[in-house]
């Protein structure tokens, strides 16, 4: 007999996302409670996936006018080509289309050449325009072309060299991961009378191409997909007994859970942390009440209003006798109506 104890293990009922001074790049994610030992298990797994497996964009090769190889120097340019390439590796990019794509740069001295001088086109965003690439003396000029592609993890320069590479094309080591740093710690936390559950705290820094909370969500999805391979049994289907359904006093759509809506990770987590489970809970909230929710901003509010409008609903509605005492049972009975 299969021991289905996974149904009995405690799952986190609290997920906090605390943005840093730059919410696009820094955040602390706290999940609790977890079974004893699961903080270390999940923290280590999430950290490894965050650092190695998320997709990002990076420069794969560069061409500089008048330069044949990376051990050259350029007249009037203070940095040698090796240093310029090291700076190019630090470019933070967001690619909005399938690669590879091209960027270019052309500038005359004197002055500092930064990432903001790059002409990237509509498909590429340069996220750190203040990054210094090189310095030009009076009368000096530099022209460069970059190849940008999507990938994951680290790819050495020799793997970025195409077979038909023209003379002067210099492949670059590519670090695709949009996540720069991840650390985690595990502490004890209390749930009811039990004092030794785990509390997992993740500190995440990205390059701005992805928010830390989205990065965690994608990493968790990767783990979920990989672990599904090891589930080698089928769970028996529960037999549903047809019963007469009582007539509802409200729209059956209110029984739908908010985590089934197509919301962003940030919006979904804000609702979860505010104990908003069903759409019926959500629509009774006013806009001002929602905006007082921690980490919930105008962008999330507009997103939720748009989703509700598609269902013919809006915030600030009144639902008499909500929630019904048998809400979970009703939600199962009427799930074919929403």
Swiss-Prot record:
GO terms for cellular component: cytoplasm; DNA-directed RNA polymerase complex. Residues 1-234 are annotated as: Alpha N-terminal domain (alpha-NTD). It is an enzyme of class 2 (transferase). Its EC number is 2.7.7.6. It catalyses: RNA(n) + a ribonucleoside 5'-triphosphate = RNA(n+1) + diphosphate. InterPro entries: DNA-dir_RNA_pol_insert, DNA-dir_RNA_pol_RpoA/D/Rpb3, DNA-dir_RpoA, RBP11-like, RNAP_asu_C, RNApol_insert_sf. GO terms for molecular function: DNA binding; DNA-directed RNA polymerase activity; protein dimerization activity. Keywords: DNA-directed RNA polymerase, Nucleotidyltransferase, Transcription, Transferase. Pfam families: RNA_pol_A_bac, RNA_pol_A_CTD, RNA_pol_L. Residues 250-338 are annotated as: Alpha C-terminal domain (alpha-CTD). GO terms for biological process: DNA-templated transcription. DNA-dependent RNA polymerase catalyzes the transcription of DNA into RNA using the four ribonucleoside triphosphates as substrates. Belongs to the RNA polymerase alpha chain family. The N-terminal domain is essential for RNAP assembly and basal transcription, whereas the C-terminal domain is involved in interaction with transcriptional regulators and with upstream promoter elements. Homodimer. The RNAP catalytic core consists of 2 alpha, 1 beta, 1 beta' and 1 omega subunit. When a sigma factor is associated with the core the holoenzyme is formed, which can initiate transcription. This is DNA-directed RNA polymerase subunit alpha. The gene is rpoA.
């Amino acid at each position: 007999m299969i021991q289905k104890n996974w149904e009995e293990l405690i799952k986190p009922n609290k997920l906090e996302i605390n943005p840093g001074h730059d919410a696009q790049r820094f955040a602390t994610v706290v999940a609790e409670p977890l079974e004893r030992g699961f903080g270390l298990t999940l923290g280590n797994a999430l950290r490894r996936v965050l650092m190695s497996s998320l997709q990002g964009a990076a420069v794969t090769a560069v061409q500089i006018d008048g330069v044949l190889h990376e051990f050259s120097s350029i007249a009037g340019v203070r940095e040698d080509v090796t240093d310029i390439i090291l700076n190019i590796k630090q470019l933070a990019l967001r690619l909005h289309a399938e690669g590879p794509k091209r960027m270019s740069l052309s500038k005359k001295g004197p002055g500092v050449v930064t990432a903001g001088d790059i002409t990237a086109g509509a498909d590429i965003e340069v996220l750190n325009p203040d990054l210094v690439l090189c310095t030009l003396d009076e009368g000096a000029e530099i022209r460069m072309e970059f190849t940008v592609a999507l990938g994951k993890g680290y790819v050495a320069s020799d793997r970025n060299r195409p077979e038909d590479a023209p003379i002067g094309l210099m492949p670059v080591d590519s670090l695709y991961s949009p996540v720069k740093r991840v650390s985690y710690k595990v502490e004890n936390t209390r749930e009811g009378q039990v004092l030794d559950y785990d509390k997992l705290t993740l500190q995440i820094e990205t390059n701005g191409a992805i928010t830390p909370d989205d990065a965690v969500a994608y990493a968790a999805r990767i783990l979920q997909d990989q672990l599904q391979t090891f589930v080698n049994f089928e769970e028996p289907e529960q037999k549903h007994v047809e019963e007469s359904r009582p007539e509802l006093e409200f729209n059956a759509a209110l029984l739908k859970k908010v985590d089934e809506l197509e919301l962003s990770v940030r919006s979904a987590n804000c609702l979860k942390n505010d104990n908003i489970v069903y759409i019926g809970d959500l629509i009774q909230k006013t806009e001002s009440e929602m905006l007082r929710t921690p980490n919930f901003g105008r962008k999330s509010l507009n997103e939720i209003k748009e989703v509700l409008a598609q269902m013919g609903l809006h915030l600030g509605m009144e639902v008499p006798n909500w929630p019904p005492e048998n809400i979970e049972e009703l939600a199962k009975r009427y799930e074919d109506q929403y």
